[in-house]
Regions:
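Conserved glycine-rich cofactor-binding loop
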Residues: 18-19
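Conserved glycine-rich Rossmann-like NAD(P)H-binding loop of the short-chain dehydrogenase/reductase
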Residues: 32-49
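Conserved NAD(P)H cofactor-binding loop of Rossmann-fold oxidoreductase domains
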Residues: 94-99
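Substrate-binding pocket helix/loop in short-chain dehydrogenase/reductase
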Residues: 102-115
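Active-site helix of classical SDR
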Residues: 126, 162
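Residue(s) in the substrate-gating loop at a strand-loop-helix junction
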Residues: 146
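SDR active-site lid
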Residues: 179-243, 256-259, 270
């Protein structure tokens, strides 16, 4: 099913769009003529990207700085869009982060913030914006999950479980919406060159210890695959042949074999054992 056609009063809401995959998805949608609303905490970065995509593609690019761990901020986001006269025809739930290391050494505040961003915000924004899409008989939702969704992930236990939730939720929501004119796609990238792991306390070298470089995919390629999958109405998109193979292997292989291997190779667990 084609994406909803661009309109002056419609927008593609992209969370986590100040950098990485989110910024690349916003640029890809703008390249296709869609106005975008960029949402993240860093207003300075959002403004710079908004200027860039507006100048490059001649689309309306809005900026709303918000902390999506806060449910009040999510409701305020909906109200602000209404005040600006915009309806959300494309929703991209991309905001997210990971914690790394064994659970017994984790920080409670960080673990809960991750769940609020990676899980709660996805559910809340779908609950807020999907009803309007159904009423208008047009809309598309792209939820960023991960290849970590296909098997438990020692060393990132909460993150893997969060992304498994996003994948399951997206597939169920897509089935519920069949025939309404609204589609749902789960984007499941493998490792992406975005500084994501480094922001979680690991260097790129440490993060790539357990994953060969040929599995890493540029953010722009992930974004293009995600938007193409969204336009085609695919329920799941896994960019990169190596990552598709890895996801299937992780899903079908006996967990009694997979989990000890993952635990032994995860760089955060290696680091914890050394420390």
């Amino acid at each position: 099913m084609p994406l909803p056609p661009p309109k002056e009063t419609s927008t593609a809401l992209v969370t986590g769009s100040s950098s990485g995959i989110g910024a690349a998805i916003a640029a890809e949608l703008a390249r296709r003529g869609h106005g975008v609303t960029l949402v993240a905490r860093r207003e300075d970065k959002l403004k710079a990207l908004a200027t860039e995509v507006a100048d490059a593609h001649g689309v309306r690019a809005e900026v709303i700085a918000a902390d999506l761990t806060d449910d009040t901020a999510r409701l305020d986001l909906a109200g602000e869009l209404e005040r600006r006269g915009l309806t959300v025809d494309i929703l991209v739930n991309n905001a997210g982060f990971t914690t790394m290391g064994p659970v017994h050494l984790s920080r409670r505040d960080q673990e809960l913030a991750m769940v609020r961003t990676d899980v709660e915000a996805v559910v809340d924004l779908c609950t807020i914006f999907v009803p309007g899409m159904v009423t208008r008989h047009r809309g598309a939702v792209l939820n960023t999950a991960s290849t970590a969704a296909f098997q438990p992930l020692p060393g990132q236990a909460g993150y893997g479980a969060s992304k498994a939730f996003v994948l399951s939720y997206s597939r169920a929501l897509g089935a519920e919406l069949k025939g309404t004119g609204v589609t749902v796609t789960a984007l499941c990238p493998g490792p992406v060159e975005t500084g994501f792991a480094e922001a979680s306390g690991l260097s790129d070298e440490e993060a790539s210890e357990s994953l060969p470089r040929f599995m890493w995919v540029p953010a722009e390629r992930v974004a293009a695959a995600g938007v193409e999958g969204l336009e085609a109405g695919r329920p799941v998109v896994i960019p990169g042949a190596a990552n598709r193979f890895g996801a299937l292997a992780g899903y079908y292989a006996p967990k009694s074999l997979v989990l000890p291997l993952l635990a032994s190779q995860h760089p955060a667990l290696k680091k914890a054992r050394r420390d």
